Structure formats: C-alpha cells, structure tokens
Amino acid sequence: MAGNREDRKAKVIEVLNKARAMELHAIHQYMNQHYSLDDMDYGELAANMKLIAIDEMRHAENFAERIKELGGEPTTQKEGKVVTGQAVPVIYESDADQEDATIEAYSQFLKVCKEQGDIVTARLFERIIEEEQAHLTYYENIGSHIKNLGDTYLAKIAGTPSSTGTASKGFVTATPAAE
C-alpha cells in the first residue's frame, strides 16, 4: 500500500465516481429502452428493463453514499450518450455488451480498492458485480430467445402487462434467487 492515506482514499473515490458515472448512463439507457419496449407493447420486457434500471439507481446511490463517507463529492455526470431508436434484438445485444464492459471495469476498480486497502469499497464492488452478472445473464438469455425464435418469441411477449407497481425493488431483488 504505497502512498499516504489521503492519496489512497482519493484513488478509491476516483474509481467510485467512474463507476457512478457508468451507472448514471445505464439508468438513462435502460429507462429509455423501457419506454420504447412499452410503446411497442412488449410489457414483460419493458417491466424487466425498468427493474434493471432501478437496480442501477440503487448502485449509483450506493456508490454516492460511499463517496460521501470517504469525503468525496459524487459525480452527477453520466458516462456516454444514450442510444435511442434501437430495434428489439439490438437492445439486448448492446445491453449485454454494456453489462460485460461494466463487469470488466468494476473488476479492475475492485483491484484498485484492494490495492489501496479499502475492503469496505471492495466488498461493495463485489456485491454489485454479482448483480451486474445477473443482468448480463438476463440480457444474454433474452437475446438468445429473440435470435433463435425471432418473431414467435416476440409475439408471445406482445400484449403482456408492463406495470411493475409503485413498490418496485429492482430486477435483482424481485427475481427469486437460484437455490
């Protein structure tokens, strides 16, 4: 652990803010996709997209809280631009790519935290990486269904309810854990 405590803390705050910016982008991207899927009458897909966006909101808040605990200022800037007007198959392919890149980045951020001796933030990244992995698996599964079954799968989803209710907890907390 090279460097003084303030330098180590600054490095952790830096990666936390990078992660927060990634989460803020994901929130905007996934909510835009939620609205698009809902407009196309793919309610079940829209509802799950909203739940995943809620997970990302929780992640952004968790990062902000940790940044504040360390004496930093949470960023309000999102990383990247929101892509609009995507076809349904493209949504799931691009979101899987985004989640994969997020997992890779967070794994690097986790290493930084461990190198700086911040086990609390390292544990936060470990927990969030697990949730991002659940999102990746979901996007890959839906993408595979769309690729293999095409319009047949989408017809099955068309007309399904999109409401997630007012007490939505997010995708990870709403999905039963694998036993």
Curated annotation (Swiss-Prot):
Q: Which CDD domains match?
A: Bacterioferritin (cd00907)
Task: Name a GO molecular-function annotation.
Answer: iron ion sequestering activity
Which positions does UniProt annotate for Fe-coproporphyrin III binding?
A: 57
| One GO process term, biological-process aspect | intracellular iron ion homeostasis
Q: Which residues form the Ferritin-like diiron domain?
A: 1-150
Please give one Pfam family short name: Ferritin
- Binding of Fe cation 1 occurs at 23, 56, 59, 132
Required co-factors: Fe-coproporphyrin III; Fe cation
Instruction: Quote the cofactor binding remark.
Output: Binds 1 Fe-coproporphyrin III group per dimer. Binds 2 iron ions per subunit.
Keywords for this protein: Heme, Iron, Iron storage, Metal-binding, Oxidoreductase
Record keyword NAD present:
no
Tell me which residues bind Fe cation 2. Answer: 56, 99, 132, 135
User: In the UniProt entry for this protein, what further remark is given in the free-text comments?
Assistant: The catalytic dinuclear iron-binding site within each subunit is known as the ferroxidase center.
Subunit (UniProt): Homooligomer of 24 subunits, arranged as 12 dimers, that are packed together to form an approximately spherical molecule with a central cavity, in which large amounts of iron can be deposited.
What role does it play? Answer: Iron-storage protein, whose ferroxidase center binds Fe(2+), oxidizes it using dioxygen to Fe(3+), and participates in the subsequent Fe(3+) oxide mineral core formation within the central cavity of the BFR protein shell.
Please give the PANTHER family that the UniProt record associates with this protein.
BACTERIOFERRITIN
Q: What is this protein called?
A: Bacterioferritin
